[in-house]
Amino acid sequence: MKFSTVILAAGKGTRMHSNMPKVLHTLAGKPMVKHVIDTCNNLGAQNIHLVYGHGGDQMQQALANENVNWVLQAQQLGTGHAVDQASPHFQDDEKILVLYGDVPLISEDTIESLLEAQPTDGIALLTVVLEDPTGYGRIVRKRGPVVAIVEQKDASEEQKLIKEVNTGVLVATGRDLKRWLAGLNNNNAQGEYYLTDVIAAAHDEGRAVEAVHPSHSIEVEGVNDRIQLARLERAFQARQAKKLLEQGVMLRDPARFDLRGTLQCGSDVEIDVNVIIEGNVSIGNNVVIGAGSILKDCEIDDNTVIRPYSVIEGATVGENCTVGPFTRLRPGAELRDDAHVGNFVEMKNARLGEGSKANHLTYLGDAEIGKGVNVGAGVITCNYDGANKHKTVIGDDVFVGSDCQLVAPVTIGNGATIGAGTTLTKNVAEGELVITRAPERKIAGWQRPAKKK
């Protein structure tokens, strides 16, 4: 179904108390307006006209990778005026869908229903019935059909009793919408050009006006302050959690889980409380994710356990691995099958081979570590010389004792042993033992200093 979209995103959002344009505030880690843009792209919108005003530079920087037509509304004179700024770009015979950058949860199904409901010579709008309609434009019907929308400030006492309200979302052909917009005036309580007045214009011409309801009222809730944004965040997360539970993922507490990207899960996955998923994350079968862990743009293979409070970003973890607690895997980190990293271990651009382990207090950066290696507590790969990064290569079956510093570039051959406390600056051959320590001294009869009285 061919259509183009106008997204209204020019509002300042005063009640957000922020220097950032309202629509750039994030929901599930993504700007609200980006949710709307993505929905339009998923539905195959031919053109997306983004009407902006306040914070234009910030908007264009944040959405630099989006294929949108930027339309400036220099003065905020109402929703009708905003849409009219984009009207020169409308094709006469195309459907024009009007959406809002601060209404991020509208679904593809609801939009498709609205597009399908639009009469050939008329207009379709999205309405919702609310128990408390205060503040919304009321839908005025005459013996069934919609004949007008009356804003709260212009409504009579009788009209204020109406519970069916306008969401602002509508669709009409470009030719009709341009004509109706050209006929708007600002003779109302707010002195603005209301988009809603096009409904009365359509009715006056004898055009059909169809009303469609969303699947759920949360889809059309807008954001004017941080309280409303927080409410939508929880509603969105509840929806995401429900989908995962239906797919068989065990969320220990769905109310304490945040998905801020996409998650693919195998079978029998268990996710404990306060876990955050960001970017694109893939989790295999029989995986356990411990409480408080953060996973971003990473892959976790089958039968692996991520213990509590681990942070994994841009990393790959193989099968039957154990990570954490309190482990940080940074971009480029890779654990091969059966590898183990424990508490306060950090890896960056490093590979830990099959069956190898670094269980305590270790930094492995720019390193390639073979199979069956034991990395003792307190080991550091010294990869940075103040100007450039250098690589550490450790072969198979190497034992690195506690509190060693491996000053890169350095290579350790298969089966070598590095004694505890060693500062290694030269390559080590296969099977060698290397120890660098100051001579041990014993002082007999030594007395500790006495405390002053």
From Swiss-Prot:
It is found in: Cytoplasm. One of its GO terms (biological process) is lipid A biosynthetic process. Residues 227-247 are annotated as: Linker. Its EC number is 2.7.7.23, 2.3.1.157. It holds the Pfam family NTP_transf_3. Residues 1-226 are annotated as: Pyrophosphorylase. It is an enzyme of class 2 (transferase). Keywords: Acyltransferase, Cell shape, Cell wall biogenesis/degradation, Cytoplasm, Magnesium, Metal-binding, Multifunctional enzyme, Nucleotidyltransferase, Peptidoglycan synthesis, Repeat, Transferase. Pathway: Nucleotide-sugar biosynthesis; UDP-N-acetyl-alpha-D-glucosamine biosynthesis; N-acetyl-alpha-D-glucosamine 1-phosphate from alpha-D-glucosamine 6-phosphate (route II): step 2/2; Nucleotide-sugar biosynthesis; UDP-N-acetyl-alpha-D-glucosamine biosynthesis; UDP-N-acetyl-alpha-D-glucosamine from N-acetyl-alpha-D-glucosamine 1-phosphate: step 1/1; Bacterial outer membrane biogenesis; LPS lipid A biosynthesis. UDP-N-acetyl-alpha-D-glucosamine binds at residues 8-11, 22, 73, 78-79, 100-102, 137, 151, 166, 224, 330, 348, 363, 374. Residues 248-453 are annotated as: N-acetyltransferase. One of its GO terms (molecular function) is UDP-N-acetylglucosamine diphosphorylase activity. GO terms for cellular component: cytoplasm; membrane. The active site is at residue 360. The keyword Transmembrane does not apply. The keyword Repeat applies. This is Bifunctional protein GlmU. In the N-terminal section; belongs to the N-acetylglucosamine-1-phosphate uridyltransferase family. In the C-terminal section; belongs to the transferase hexapeptide repeat family. Transmembrane segments: none annotated. Homotrimer. Acetyl-CoA binds at residues 377, 383-384, 402, 420, 437.
